[in-house]
């Protein structure tokens, strides 16, 4: 039988899912706060591939991959006030760096696919 994360609920109602001692949940947030803040973790690291890994009820959102701020299809930090910040592998970059990163990645993939 496959190990499933164990749910623990704190006295304030915060829900935590643990697997092997680490915050971990593959099918949803590993931490859910009563105020609707949510955080996604895999093996103890903030991680989510299909959306922000941290969503605050205030509207702020943060994208993480393997514990690092990282997003190649937009800003890694989006704030309620409209401000945005771009990160690649936990390094703050300019928006155009993300655009260039994407072009380079696409070109590389096309090169690999089209090799004979």
List each language-model region with its residue ranges.
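Glycine/tyrosine- and acidic-biased, solvent-exposed loop/turn segments at the edges of beta-strands
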Residues: 1-116
